[in-house]
Amino acid sequence: MRRSFSVLGPYKWLKPSSTYTNVYCFVTNPPLISNPNNGSAIFRYLSYFAPQQRRQQQQAPDPDDPANLLKEDGVSLCSQMWLENFKEPDKTATNLTSYLRRFELWVLAYQKVCCDELGAYVPRSSIQRSALENLLALRNSVLDDRFKWGSRLDFYIKSPRDKTDYESLSKRKIKAILTTTQPTPFQDRIVQEVLLMILEPIYESRFSQKSFAFRPGRTAHTVLRVIRRNFAGYLWYVKGDLSVVLDGMKVGFVISSLMRDVRDKKVIDLIKSALVTPVVTSKVEDGEKKKTKKRKYQKKRVLAEDEPKPDPYWLETFFGFAPEEAGKSPQWGHCGILSPLLVNVCLDELDRWMETKVKDFYRPSKSDVIWNNPEGEADQGNTSWPEFVPTSGPDKTRKMDYVRYGGHILIGVRGPRADAATLRKELIEFVDQKYMLRLDNENLPIEHITKGIMFLDHVLCRRVVYPTLRYTATGGKIISEKGVGTLLSVTASLKQCIKQFRKLLFIKGDRDPDPQPCFRMFHATQAHTNNQMNKFLTTIAEWYRFADNRKKIVNFCSYIIRGSLAKLYAAKYKLRSRAKVYKFANRNLSLPLLQKKGQSPEYQNLLRMGLAESVDGLVYTRMSLVPETDYSPFPGNWRPEHEKFLIEYLTLDEPKTLEEQKRFIREKGLVSPQDYTSMLVWNYKRNAIPMDQVSILKDQPFLLGSSSTYNRDNDDQKNKEEDEDSEDGLRIARM
């Protein structure tokens, strides 16, 4: 009995165009199968067609699989964006949608938002696959223009902390969610982070060096150091308040400011929709306010399981000391963390206009020994400390400088008041024309340096000093004379400090501030309370780091805090007065107040057994314990550390730098650091003077005089041999 064998497989036919075409056919070859000697032919036949069938059946990679989209690390991708923008800062950004498609940026944004939400870093390997799929759906909705800002019920991805089942909510709860103020949705914060990662490198490479707020690496301390260095010698100051810009601007102006540097439709439309979409807010009416029952003692509050932990008391107290210039943060629509960046984008045109005015206004005097170069920078270093600000020459030096911190500006003018008034008039016209803001002379007051200018809770004033000048006159006579000089003083405002303490209910009274007990720490132990206040005092000392009266202001803060805690302990432990608290707990409140003789074991024994908590005394109880003011020099071309690193990396990456290094090595030779150090040590030990002094003595032999070290009356032959060895070492060391 015969059996037939059929195979369904592809044949490749050769067409006249020399291209292969797959054709499926039904093959029947009974004699081939029936012949037992044709087994090798059947094997060759099947081995030829089976791999082709498997290759065709194999599917392409799934584009919706998150694992296939994570090809690169998100941090390295961000670093690449920063390098590209700092390499070509003037290039218009056109293709930002390609970065918006990169799933690595979305995962990095998810990690950052989760860190802010949960208080702990979430590694990429710990992210669940369901979260990655939801994150991919969010990315696709943004790319397909299906994403809506401020959604309250329809989410592509939810916070890991959010366990609410929105499908089973009642109508009353749904109405409350839709009509009352709610925190920013988790998915909105992720989209904001992605946009910030894309836009921040573009604008940070273009922003002016005169703006300092809402930018990485530029803090209020940076502004104070810039003022101390660059504003010395200015007589008139124009202080402006443009904080109205932080409340919001017209959408058309914001979009036009963005499109000066960014020409990507997808990104622009996404930001425009965030600005246009209304934010749902609710105001509690007077009749709906709940009546608060006053308690004699504060009730201890227990946090819910899913409730985020609030800021510690010391940090909340320090935030109450925020100056007026830094106490306001912009919130534009649904932009969230993008709002500060958009504020700087809009105000960057003001910075550029002021830079042009500063450059055109500068006219140095021929007799001016500080500002005598074309750019206006002082070659002698810091002009306010320790050098003295010089008086101008007969033709009077004209100079101006400008800084901006958020919506507040400060302009220093060296010249007549008429120049400052002219500048103020031009500034009012520019702001009215560009930003549609009506400013008057009250918003831009002109003040003299002798009255003191308040900026960032520090007072800028001029201090007269009488130094002793010593110089050598003709004939070698040393003359000492008393001179007169002026210094720019940056002093912390004690009046503003008292105002902040009064606002936080730490003191009462105007002329003689009286500390009040801080009952917020009533339920805390003495050790915990002292620890909290020590952190606050340490942070305050760091905030006033560059103030000339740092010791005085920090010691005053320590006095207020110490008196407040003493009154708290007197009420808590029923000691009636602060004097008894200081008697039992010492001046710095370091001794435990619960310890009483004859009623409990000694405190040291409890501490040794680990049954008691050590009590740290308050810091800065004496003025001598407060750190000194930081007068470290500030460079004129200062940049943040990350910008210096980027610029240095780009410089080293250029082929021109490598060619210069090769040429230098060919001309000068190569000396290892070990050889150079050993040569320095050898010459120092042999000659008992450093290498740089040896070079000076070699170049200028008349400075040797009658020194016994180089006495020419010594053995000439021995000195000749030593000089030959020393010259060889000097040649290598200089190379």
Curated annotation (Swiss-Prot):
<feature type="region of interest" description="Intron maturase type-2">
    <location>
        <begin position="485"/>
        <end position="653"/>
    </location>
</feature>
<dbReference type="GO" id="GO:0007005">
    <property type="term" value="P:mitochondrion organization"/>
</dbReference>
<comment type="subunit">
    <text>Associated to a large ribonucleoprotein complex in mitochondria containing group-II intron RNAs.</text>
</comment>
<comment type="function">
    <text>Nuclear-encoded maturase required for splicing of group-II introns in mitochondria. Involved in the splicing of mitochondrial COX2, NAD1 and NAD7 transcripts. Necessary for mitochondrial biogenesis during early developmental stages.</text>
</comment>
<dbReference type="GO" id="GO:0005739">
    <property type="term" value="C:mitochondrion"/>
</dbReference>
<feature type="compositionally biased region" description="Basic and acidic residues">
    <location>
        <begin position="712"/>
        <end position="721"/>
    </location>
</feature>
<dbReference type="InterPro" id="IPR051083">
    <property type="entry name" value="GrpII_Intron_Splice-Mob/Def"/>
</dbReference>
<dbReference type="GO" id="GO:0004519">
    <property type="term" value="F:endonuclease activity"/>
</dbReference>
<keyword id="KW-0404">Intron homing</keyword>
<dbReference type="InterPro" id="IPR024937">
    <property type="entry name" value="Domain_X"/>
</dbReference>
<dbReference type="GO" id="GO:0000373">
    <property type="term" value="P:Group II intron splicing"/>
</dbReference>
<feature type="transit peptide" description="Mitochondrion">
    <location>
        <begin position="1"/>
        <end position="12"/>
    </location>
</feature>
<keyword id="KW-0496">Mitochondrion</keyword>
<dbReference type="GO" id="GO:0090615">
    <property type="term" value="P:mitochondrial mRNA processing"/>
</dbReference>
<feature type="region of interest" description="Disordered">
    <location>
        <begin position="707"/>
        <end position="735"/>
    </location>
</feature>
<protein>
    <recommendedName>
        <fullName>Nuclear intron maturase 2, mitochondrial</fullName>
        <ecNumber>3.1.-.-</ecNumber>
    </recommendedName>
</protein>
<keyword id="KW-0540">Nuclease</keyword>
<dbReference type="GO" id="GO:0006314">
    <property type="term" value="P:intron homing"/>
</dbReference>
<feature type="domain" description="Reverse transcriptase">
    <location>
        <begin position="161"/>
        <end position="460"/>
    </location>
</feature>
<dbReference type="Pfam" id="PF01348">
    <property type="entry name" value="Intron_maturas2"/>
</dbReference>
<keyword id="KW-0809">Transit peptide</keyword>
<keyword id="KW-0378">Hydrolase</keyword>
<keyword id="KW-0255">Endonuclease</keyword>
<dbReference type="InterPro" id="IPR043502">
    <property type="entry name" value="DNA/RNA_pol_sf"/>
</dbReference>
<comment type="similarity">
    <text>Belongs to the plant nuclear intron maturase (nMat) family.</text>
</comment>
